[in-house]
Regions:
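N-terminal carbohydrate-binding accessory modules
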Residues: 35-97
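The substrate-binding groove and active-site-proximal loops of carbohydrate-active enzymes
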Residues: 70-79, 102-120, 168-188, 274-291, ...
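Short, acidic/polar
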Residues: 77-93, 326-341, 357, 383-386
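Aromatic-lined substrate-binding rim segments of carbohydrate-active enzymes
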Residues: 83-157, 290-304
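Polysaccharide-binding and catalytic clefts of secreted carbohydrate-active enzymes
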Residues: 161-335
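Catalytic-core region of carbohydrate-active enzymes that cleave or remodel glycosidic bonds
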Residues: 296-306, 333-430
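Aromatic- and carboxylate-lined catalytic core of secreted/periplasmic carbohydrate-active enzymes
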Residues: 387-508
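C-terminal beta-sandwich/jelly-roll accessory domains of carbohydrate-active enzymes
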Residues: 469-478, 490-563
Length: 563
């Protein structure tokens, strides 16, 4: 029977006639539903897509907001059922709901025009058995700049499939984005993949997003010096990019605006005429052509099966020059070039092996770019950053790399944080983007965050500031993180670890703010269940709300005001 959330008795009591119609409607729907098999029912769902709510974008899966509690597999793990067999249970114990997994061009199309989907069909079935969703990573023309995952028939035919050249004329194992045959072959394989996903998974929706290529960028020079590239570099900057810059002149990111301004905001000319003669111009040139190439792939894929599709970037280091990092990739200082050249790309994502987390997230949310973190170092900061990114930035999700390397999954901090987010998911989904959710990220260098939520100012400090825990005396502090959700004027939920909160009234500063009630609990079937009522020493006699560093928990608290 199809279940309904309506309270039929209450509805009938309120209005007898409407109640009868409601009952008849529900009965008819139920009878009709019984005649549908499960696959037909699933066809009623929209395919996974992005939807705006307030200031954030939400990923909608099976018609509901879905936060990716993910983990990315190591590059070679998804190549056989046998290797994956012991990994699936570990992923479940980690409280993942999504696995980011590569699809390898070399395995998909070992001979030109002959595609083998058997491996991926079997792996999709294994994901279904474990109640896990998949984000496929298309290791096509480029993976970490290189073309190592291109099929052998592409690699050995260098005349047909040209490679990049550096400024000394040396070739590298990187397919040139200026080679038409490179694009045609990559695009054809991608189309075949999307067609098969639609046919095999179009009703189940196990595959919910696609990352197209992986960490695109030019190495070891800032631009490609292949004759095809040199010819394009001498041509005038395309009108398409110029029009984008003119239209968005006041809002393009300052890093790009400054490059354009140095030559007087010219609106026609070669790349060097407009942006100057330097490696930064070389990078802008590559960004344009990489984005156009990738957009062609994504546009073709979406025409077949329009899942959300994105690209990811290897972050550059401070003061490093293009070419010392993958030049022209989807990086924040050239994100407008990617937005102009890649309108079909849903968002640009950072891969984090860089400790300055807040800095890079702040850069990536510009230009209304949704934040998703497909890779993060599998380190002890990952749990805190996961909950912070979802709380503060409204991130679509979080995914540490080489997730299968976890040795003790059930006791892993990330597993505990994912469990908390999973329980809070209905609240997060309801209040995201509406100014009711915040996140905190705390360590010894940043031991305090001050938040304004409704009528209150919340001062959130690392629990080590209390001095109660032995590790508070350490030279460095373990990173703490949490999400805070305001569900009513005086009601809040906080989930995470390692914090202490005090309060002020923003509207009437002369009033004191008291803690009316604090409960520790959990959500079971989306219903709040109290485990402990906290008071006395656990709230410092009503002075604060706290959870110690290793106390991964959810607290519900109410505030009140007094003279």
């Amino acid at each position: 029977m199809i279940k309904t959330d309506f309270d039929i008795a209450r509805l009938c009591k309120k209005n007898h006639f409407i109640g009868i119609l409601a009952v008849l409607s529900i009965i008819c729907s139920s009878l009709y539903g019984q005649n549908l098999n499960s696959k037909q029912e699933q066809k009623l769902h929209q395919i996974p897509h992005l939807k705006k709510q307030g200031t954030v974008s939400q990923l909608i899966v099976d018609d509901k907001p879905f936060i990716i509690l993910g983990g990315e597999l190591g590059n070679s793990s998804f190549t056989s059922l046998e290797y994956m067999h012991p990994i699936w249970p570990k992923l479940k114990k980690m409280n993942l709901n999504t696995v980011l997994a590569p699809v390898y061009w070399e395995l998909l199309e070992p001979e030109e025009g002959k595609f083998d989907f058997d491996l991926y069909d079997q792996l999709i079935n294994e994901a279904r058995k474990n109640n896990l969703k998949l984000v496929f990573l298309w290791f096509g023309a480029w993976k970490n700049s290189m073309s190592s995952h291109a099929p052998a028939w592409v690699k050995i035919d260098q005349k047909r499939f040209p490679r990049v050249k550096d400024n000394k004329g040396k070739s590298h194992e990187i397919l040139s984005p200026f080679g038409e045959e490179n694009l045609k072959a990559d695009l054809k394989a991608y189309e075949a993949l999307m067609k098969h996903i639609k046919e095999f998974d179009g009703t189940e929706n196990t595959v919910i997003m696609i990352q197209t290529e992986n960490e695109i960028g030019m190495l070891p020079t800032a631009r490609d010096y292949h004759p095809l590239a040199n010819k394009k570099f001498q041509e005038n900057v395309t009108v398409e990019l110029i029009n984008y810059l003119k239209k968005n002149k006041k809002v393009i990111v300052p890093e790009l605006s400054e490059r354009w301004a140095k030559n007087g905001f010219k609106e026609s000319g070669t790349w060097e005429d407009i942006f100057g003669k330097n490696v930064h111009t070389d990078e802008i040139f590559m960004a344009w052509h990489y984005s156009k190439y990738t957009n062609s792939i994504i546009e073709a894929g979406k025409a077949i099966y329009a899942l959300p599709m994105f690209v990811n970037a290897a972050l550059n280091r401070t003061d490093s020059l293009p070419g010392s990092y993958p030049s022209g990739g989807p990086l924040p200082h050239i994100m407008d070039v990617w937005k102009a050249g890649g309108p079909s790309i849903d968002f640009l994502s950072p891969d984090f092996y860089n400790p300055n987390f807040k800095h890079w997230c702040d850069l990536y949310i510009r230009q209304q770019n949704p934040l998703f973190i497909p890779e993060h170092s599998l380190d002890k900061t990952a749990a805190a950053k996961a909950v912070y990114s979802i709380g503060h930035y409204g991130a679509l999700g979080f995914s540490p790399f080489s997730i299968e390397d976890i040795n003790d999954p059930e006791n892993e901090p990330l597993a505990k944080i994912y469990n908390i987010i999973k329980q809070l998911n209905p609240l997060i989904s309801a209040y995201q983007g509406l100014g009711k959710i915040e996140g905190v990220l705390l360590d010894k260098e940043t031991p305090m965050n001050v938040l304004k939520m409704g009528n209150y100012e919340l001062t959130v400090k690392h629990s080590y500031t209390l001095g109660y825990e032995k590790d508070s005396k350490n030279e460095t502090w373990d990173m703490a993180g949490a999400i805070i959700i305001q569900t009513a004027e005086n009601e809040f939920y906080v989930g995470g670890s390692g914090l202490v909160i005090t309060f002020k009234n923003l509207i009437k500063p002369d009033l004191n703010v008291g803690i009316l009630k604090v409960d520790e609990g959990k959500f079971e079937s989306n219903k709040w269940k109290v485990i402990r009522h906290l008071n006395g020493d656990q709230t410092h006699q009503g002075r604060h709300v706290r959870m110690m560093y290793n106390d991964y928990s959810i607290l519900r608290f109410e505030l009140y005001n007094y003279d």
